[in-house]
C-alpha cells in the first residue's frame, strides 16, 4: 500500500539487472516494473528487478494505436506474464496512436477494462500533451476515476517542483523527473475511494438528467465534477447537454452526454477548440505543430479562405491548417488557389 507523498521508481530493461543503486538514491524500494511491449517483447530483467524491490505494480508499453482487437491481444499478453500479485497494472500509452482520438480512447478503455476484469486496478500512463492530442481522457476518468499517471518534468532537475505540475483531472501519480532515472510521487492514498468525491446517483425523468447526492441534495445553477468529469446543472438541477454555456464571459460546450468538452469539438458542421479548462479559444491555435485560426466573433475554425491577422493575410487550407504559403502584407487581388 502506498500513501500520499510516497515515492517510487519505474524501471525497465533500460535500467539493467541491478537497480539497487537507483533505489538507494531515491530512498525507496517501491517500483513499477515494465513487463511487456506489444505481443512479443518481455523485459529480460524482470525477475531480478522484482527480487530487488517492492513492486507496487507493473506496466505494459502499448503499440495497439486505435485497434481494439490488438488492444485485447496486448492486454492478454500482459496479464499472462504478471509474475506476482499487485494492486496496479498500468497501460503505458505514449507512442503509435492512430489519427482517430475516439478509436484510440476506445482501445485504451478496452485494455483497461480487461485489467479491471482480471481483478487489478488499471492505470493510464502518458504525457499531458500526447494525451490531449490523441485520447479523450475524460472518458477514461468516467470509467476509471483517479486512474491517471502523468509525466511532466518542468526543469527536469530531479526534484518535484509543483510549479511545473501537469494539471489535469484524476491524476493519482506524477512522474516529475527522468533525471537521472524516472522519479514518481503518489498524490492519492491507496485507501482513498476511487469513486467520485460527490457520491450519489444519476436520475432521469421526462425533462432530463439530474444528480441526486447521497445526502438527498442535488446540484443546481453550478458546475459539479462527478467521476472526474465536469457537468453543468441549470436552475432546476437538470444537466445541460448538447448546449453552449456562457459563464464568466467565457463559452463552454456540454456534449451530448453532458460532459464538458475539451480539445477539438464538432458542433453541427463547425469545429471549435476548447482549452484545458473547457473555455472556447479564439484566434490562433497550435495543434500537433500545425496552426489553425478560430474566429474572434464565434470561435469556429476558419477553412478554405484568407484571414487577416495583424498586418498579414494568411490562407487556411480546407482542413483548417495554415498553408505554408502564401502570407501577404495586403489583401490579394483575384482568386488564388493554394494546393
Swiss-Prot record:
The family database entries (CDD domains) matched by this protein are listed as:
GH25_Cpl1-like
* Domain Ch-type lysozyme: residue ranges: 5-206
**Reactions mediated catalytically:** Hydrolysis of (1->4)-beta-linkages between N-acetylmuramic acid and N-acetyl-D-glucosamine residues in a peptidoglycan and between N-acetyl-D-glucosamine residues in chitodextrins
- PROSITE patterns, sorted: CW, GLYCOSYL_HYDROL_F25_1, GLYCOSYL_HYDROL_F25_2
EC numbers: 3.2.1.17
- Cell wall-binding repeat coordinates: 200-219, 220-239, 241-260, 261-280, 281-300, 303-322
**Biological process, per Gene Ontology:** cell wall macromolecule catabolic process; defense response to bacterium; peptidoglycan catabolic process; viral release from host cell by cytolysis
Q: Name one GO molecular function term.
A: lysozyme activity
The source's superkingdom equals Viruses
Q: What is the effect of changing residue 94 to A/Q?
A: Almost complete loss of activity
Q: Which UniProt keywords apply?
A: Antimicrobial, Bacteriolytic enzyme, Glycosidase, Hydrolase, Repeat
Tell me which family the UniProt entry assigns to this protein.
Belongs to the glycosyl hydrolase 25 family.
Any idea what job this protein has?
Answer: Responsible for the separation of the host daughter cells at the end of cell division and participates in the liberation of progeny bacteriophage into the medium. Strictly depends on the presence of choline-containing cell walls for activity.
Domains as described in the record: The C-terminal domain comprising the repeats is involved in choline binding.
Which named protein is this? Answer: Lysozyme
Amino acid at each position: 500500500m502506498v500513501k500520499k507523498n510516497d515515492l517510487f521508481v519505474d524501471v525497465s530493461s533500460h535500467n539493467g539487472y541491478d537497480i539497487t543503486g537507483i533505489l538507494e538514491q531515491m530512498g525507496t524500494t517501491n517500483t513499477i516494473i515494465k513487463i511487456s511491449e506489444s505481443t512479443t517483447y518481455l523485459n529480460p530483467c524482470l525477475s531480478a528487478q522484482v527480487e530487488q524491490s517492492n513492486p507496487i505494480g507493473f506496466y505494459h508499453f502499448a503499440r495497439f494505436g486505435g485497434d481494439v482487437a490488438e488492444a485485447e491481444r496486448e492486454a492478454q499478453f500482459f496479464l499472462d506474464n504478471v509474475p506476482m500479485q499487485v494492486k496496479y497494472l498500468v497501460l503505458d500509452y505514449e507512442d503509435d496512436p492512430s489519427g482517430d482520438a475516439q478509436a484510440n480512447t476506445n482501445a485504451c478503455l478496452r485494455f483497461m477494462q480487461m485489467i479491471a476484469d482480471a481483478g487489478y486496478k488499471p492505470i493510464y500512463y502518458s504525457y499531458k500533451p500526447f494525451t490531449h492530442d490523441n485520447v479523450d481522457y475524460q472518458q477514461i476518468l468516467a470509467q476509471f476515476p483517479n486512474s491517471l499517471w502523468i509525466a511532466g518534468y518542468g526543469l527536469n532537475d530531479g526534484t518535484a517542483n509543483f510549479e511545473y505540475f501537469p494539471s489535469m483531472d484524476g491524476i493519482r501519480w506524477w512522474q516529475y523527473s527522468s533525471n537521472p532515472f524516472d522519479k514518481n510521487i503518489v498524490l492519492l492514498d491507496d485507501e482513498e475511494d476511487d469513486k467520485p468525491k460527490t457520491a450519489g446517483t444519476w436520475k432521469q425523468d421526462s425533462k432530463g438528467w439530474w444528480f441526486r447526492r447521497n445526502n438527498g441534495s442535488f446540484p443546481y445553477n453550478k458546475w459539479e465534477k462527478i467521476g472526474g468529469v465536469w457537468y453543468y446543472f441549470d436552475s432546476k438541477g437538470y444537466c445541460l447537454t448538447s448546449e453552449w454555456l456562457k459563464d464568466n464571459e467565457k463559452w463552454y460546450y456540454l456534449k451530448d452526454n453532458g460532459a464538458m468538452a475539451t480539445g477539438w469539438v464538432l458542433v453541427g458542421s463547425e469545429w471549435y477548440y476548447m482549452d484545458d479548462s473547457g473555455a472556447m479559444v479564439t484566434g490562433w491555435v497550435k495543434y500537433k505543430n500545425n496552426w489553425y485560426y478560430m474566429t474572434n466573433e464565434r470561435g469556429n475554425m476558419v477553412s478554405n479562405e484568407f484571414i487577416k491577422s495583424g498586418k498579414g493575410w494568411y490562407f487556411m487550407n480546407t482542413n483548417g491548417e495554415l498553408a505554408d504559403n502564401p502570407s501577404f502584407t495586403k489583401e490579394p487581388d483575384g482568386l488564388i488557389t493554394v494546393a
